Amino acid sequence: MPTRRTPKPGQRKKPNILRERGITYVDYKDVALLRQFISDRGKIRARRITGLTPRQHREVTRAIKNAREMALLPYPGPAAARGR
């Protein structure tokens, strides 16, 4: 049976932004909140970076994708990846 990893000294869990603010529903129209979960290239940040729970990450991902469809947030594309 594999052993659990113990955190390294000085390492701590990432703060959960949604839990800190008491947000239970992630709205696709709340662009200011969603931008915190997107990189400068327009990609969705990983859970280990954001500190979200799996369920919260799914909700944020769904909201970001809906906001992209409504042209509120940018899509990551080849031009954004190459710096054009």
Swiss-Prot record:
Tell me the first and last residues of the signal peptide.
Answer: none
Q: Does the keyword Transmembrane helix apply?
A: no
An annotated GO cellular component of this protein is: cytosolic small ribosomal subunit
* Family matches, as InterPro entries: Ribosomal_bS18, Ribosomal_bS18_CS, Ribosomal_bS18_sf
One Pfam annotation reads Ribosomal_S18
The GO annotation for biological process reads: translation
Which Gene3D superfamilies does the entry mention?
A: Ribosomal protein S18 (4.10.640.10)
Q: What GO MF terms are annotated?
A: small ribosomal subunit rRNA binding; structural constituent of ribosome
Q: Which UniProt keywords apply?
A: Ribonucleoprotein, Ribosomal protein, RNA-binding, rRNA-binding
- Out of the domains of life, which is the source? Bacteria
Q: Which family does it belong to?
A: Belongs to the bacterial ribosomal protein bS18 family.
The family database entries (PANTHER family) matched by this protein are listed as: 30S RIBOSOMAL PROTEIN S18 (PTHR13479), SMALL RIBOSOMAL SUBUNIT PROTEIN BS18M (PTHR13479:SF40)
User: Subunit comment for this entry?
Assistant: Part of the 30S ribosomal subunit. Forms a tight heterodimer with protein bS6.
Database matches in NCBIfam families: S18
Q: What does this protein do?
A: Binds as a heterodimer with protein bS6 to the central domain of the 16S rRNA, where it helps stabilize the platform of the 30S subunit.
Q: What is this protein called?
A: Small ribosomal subunit protein bS18A
The organism named in the record is Frankia alni (strain DSM 45986 / CECT 9034 / ACN14a)
Classification lineage: Bacteria, Bacillati, Actinomycetota, Actinomycetes, Frankiales
Q: Which gene encodes it?
A: rpsR1
